[in-house]
């Protein structure tokens, strides 16, 4: 099953081939239709509690790995301001040993974000696709302990666009979700990564 397709031309800035980048992740997508509350900023903590805390292998939402820069949950959204709002909403899961980390570009330079990720024990990271990829490329952010990726799909911006409608976000989002280190763990037993659409 293909959940999203982006023409290769779109992300190669005028490449000659019209090949499509497809992401086959049907086994990783967790059915969240049982969530009965409106999918608002304030409801995200309840959403995570309902769908992220059931299996034995999973860390509690307020825990983090011993290694810095290694969240169990990544929340991916389309804009820095939205990421800041979601970060505030998720603070209830923050402890002195486990932070809810900001992983977005708005007012935070990449160098500063890299330094912060390398020093921070985070349970949850909230950010934009491109910044998360930049941190992964640097090695400041690690996915070894990652258990789930939550895509903020229900939020609609002032221009009436969702994260899957924004061309400037579509390509980085598909590239992020299609990264080899994630793709090979989608829906596969021990150490699997689940995809949740909020």
Regions found by a protein language model. Give the residues of each.
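P-loop NTPase motor module signature
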Residues: 1, 33, 102, 107-110, ...
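Low-complexity, highly charged intrinsically disordered N-terminal segments
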Residues: 5-91
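Conserved catalytic network of the ASCE P-loop NTPase/AAA+ motor domain
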Residues: 64-68, 93-95, 116-119, 140-144, ...
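Structural recognition of the conserved hydrophobic beta-strand(s) that form the central parallel beta-sheet
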Residues: 75, 124-127, 150, 195-197
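Conserved helicase motor
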Residues: 77-80, 101-112, 129-131, 154
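Conserved helix-turn-beta segment of the N-terminal RecA-like "Helicase ATP-binding" lobe
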Residues: 88-104, 140
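Conserved motor-coupling elements within RecA-like helicase/translocase cores
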Residues: 110-126
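Post-DEXD/H (motif II) to motif III coupling segment of the RecA-like Helicase ATP-binding lobe
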Residues: 140-151, 156-198
